[in-house]
């Protein structure tokens, strides 16, 4: 596989910060500057096709930057052939940076662990949970620049997100509202969320439950959790509420320091 020599620098980003509903006031230090804490890359690898992590395999990317050498196509739906990594049942991807030169980042085709994985710039989605019944565990790492979703949960089962950093995003987590009447759940802890629309979206009429406690922090985020009414026939979901509901269980979040 060809190796690219360019290293990925730490990105320093400037943004205005406002307090959203149920959020603490903006931190004055953060209002001056937010630095997305992506690690320095140890090298670059461009795949000509998706790299498959076998069932039960642990793949350590050693903090290299991985991509596909293509331009992002925005919110045009990609497919499995457009991914950087495909993780099979019980597989683990850790210590990797997903570069901006890709369309679909990572697919999990069963329970998976995503540990200390960073997205330089999200394209359509960062992580898509396509098959299986979980659990799907995301620990550490982070993503930025997601026009819409970071984690897309299509399959059934539980998602656990802990210690993730998300900046300049639409939704950190979204339970699929067009994938049929399937119950899904997510627990989100110790997340740093800066400059986004909503941390999570859940389908109340499908029995989804998203839990977000005060171990998380949020600055300039419009909503903590959004409840939708999904359409079992695949129609576009309707936003119902940004308050606490049976589907969205959350506490007031402090501003990020």
UniProtKB/Swiss-Prot annotation:
Record's GO cellular component terms: extracellular region
SUPFAM superfamilies attached to this UniProt entry: Pectin lyase-like
GO biological process: cell wall organization; pectin catabolic process
Pfam families: Pectate_lyase
Gene3D superfamilies found in the cross-reference section: Single-stranded right-handed beta-helix, Pectin lyase-like (2.160.20.10)
GO molecular function: pectate lyase activity
Location relative to the cell: Secreted
Main location: secreted
Enzyme class (EC, first level): lyase
EC number of this enzyme: 4.2.2.2
Catalytic activities: Eliminative cleavage of (1->4)-alpha-D-galacturonan to give oligosaccharides with 4-deoxy-alpha-D-galact-4-enuronosyl groups at their non-reducing ends
Cofactor note: Binds 1 Ca(2+) ion per subunit.
Signal peptide start-end: 1-24
Taxonomy, superkingdom: Eukaryota
Alphabetical list of InterPro entries matching this protein: Pectate_lyase_PlyH/PlyE-like, Pectin_lyas_fold, Pectin_lyase_fold/virulence
Cofactor requirements of the protein: Ca(2+)
Protein keywords: Calcium, Carbohydrate metabolism, Cell wall biogenesis/degradation, Lyase, Polysaccharide degradation, Secreted, Signal
Main function: Pectinolytic enzyme consist of four classes of enzymes: pectin lyase, polygalacturonase, pectin methylesterase and rhamnogalacturonase. Among pectinolytic enzymes, pectin lyase is the most important in depolymerization of pectin, since it cleaves internal glycosidic bonds of highly methylated pectins. Favors pectate, the anion, over pectin, the methyl ester.
Protein family per UniProt: Belongs to the polysaccharide lyase 3 family.
Name of the molecule in the record: Probable pectate lyase G
């Amino acid at each position: 596989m060809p190796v690219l020599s360019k290293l990925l620098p730490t990105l320093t980003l400037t943004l205005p910060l406002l307090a959203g509903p149920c959020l603490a006031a903006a931190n004055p230090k953060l209002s001056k500057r937010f630095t997305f804490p992506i690690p320095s890359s140890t090298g670059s690898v461009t795949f000509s096709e998706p790299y498959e992590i076998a069932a039960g395999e642990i793949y350590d990317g050693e903090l290299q930057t991985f991509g596909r050498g293509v331009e992002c196509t925005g919110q045009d739906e990609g497919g499995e052939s457009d991914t950087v990594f495909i993780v099979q049942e019980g597989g683990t991807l850790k210590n990797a940076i997903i570069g901006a030169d890709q369309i679909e980042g990572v697919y999990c085709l069963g329970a998976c662990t995503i540990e200390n994985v960073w997205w330089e710039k999200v394209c359509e989605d960062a992580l898509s949970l396509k098959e299986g019944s979980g659990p799907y565990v995301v620990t550490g790492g982070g993503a930025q620049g997601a026009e819409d979703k970071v984690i897309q949960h299509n399959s059934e089962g539980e998602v656990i997100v802990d210690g993730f950093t998300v900046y300049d995003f639409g939704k950190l987590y979204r339970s699929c509202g067009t994938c049929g009447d399937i119950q899904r759940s997510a627990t989100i802890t110790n997340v740093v969320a800066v400059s986004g629309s909503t941390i999570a979206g859940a389908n109340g009429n499908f029995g989804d439950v998203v839990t977000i406690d005060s171990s998380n922090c949020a600055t300039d985020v419009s909503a903590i959790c959004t409840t939708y009414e999904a359409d079992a026939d695949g129609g576009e979901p309707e936003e119902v509420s940004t308050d606490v509901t049976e589907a969205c269980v959350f506490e007031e979040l402090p501003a990020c320091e």
